[in-house]
């Protein structure tokens, strides 16, 4: 596909050479304008997918659209739990899709131009995910033997709780992945020395894509440590420690909740 696109571009340039100067200039302006618009559209799409304030707004809209109609059929708590699960599914799928598809150039352009405060990114990521875990815990707190009026079977409610906890865990680490990528390219853009130390040392020496930062976040979340990617600055080591502690705390609470569910 890239070979075909390159051949088509070369053929277009050959054909343009034979055009008059004014027509050739107008055509180049259209090409550059179209490329600029395309970059703006791609940047806006990535912001909508990855930044937490847009993720929160999107999740709220999806949750309301699912919960309100369901509240007419089942209990409000059950409707809220299913609505939150639906919003988490949409959010995680969009972030994973972006991580899987964007390349080195798109990653560098997007995160280099990002003007998000690193501290605010971490605070919002932690706050929103703890809030989400609290809401889903409240929604399924009726799984014990003394249940009020419930429409859904207990096994289905346990399933909703399980997948919600899993997706909240993924959303937590997606937020840290965005933070790591933002911090990495921010430090890169602040120094003019190409040999200056970066916050991460990726094996292979290639320019990282967003998926590499998702990999780092998942690795810290699952093993509570760095693996083959090295943390090279004190600043990023502090963030890794915070993420490890949060992941450990979250995992401990989730395991305790699951054990209590199956022993009721």
Question: Residues of each region from the PLM?
Answer:
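Short, hydrophobic transmembrane alpha-helix segments
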Residues: 18-22, 68-81
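Membrane-proximal soluble regions of multi-pass membrane proteins
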Residues: 184-186, 190-229
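Transmembrane alpha-helix/helix-exit interface in multi-pass inner-membrane proteins
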Residues: 166-189
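Alpha-helical transmembrane segments
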Residues: 75-91, 157-172
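The first (N-terminal) embedded transmembrane alpha-helix
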Residues: 5-11, 51-70
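Hydrophobic alpha-helical transmembrane segments of multi-pass integral membrane proteins
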Residues: 9, 61-63, 122-139, 215-219, ...
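Juxtamembrane helix-capping/reentrant segments at transmembrane boundaries
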Residues: 108-127
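Pore domain of cation channels
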Residues: 212-219, 227-264
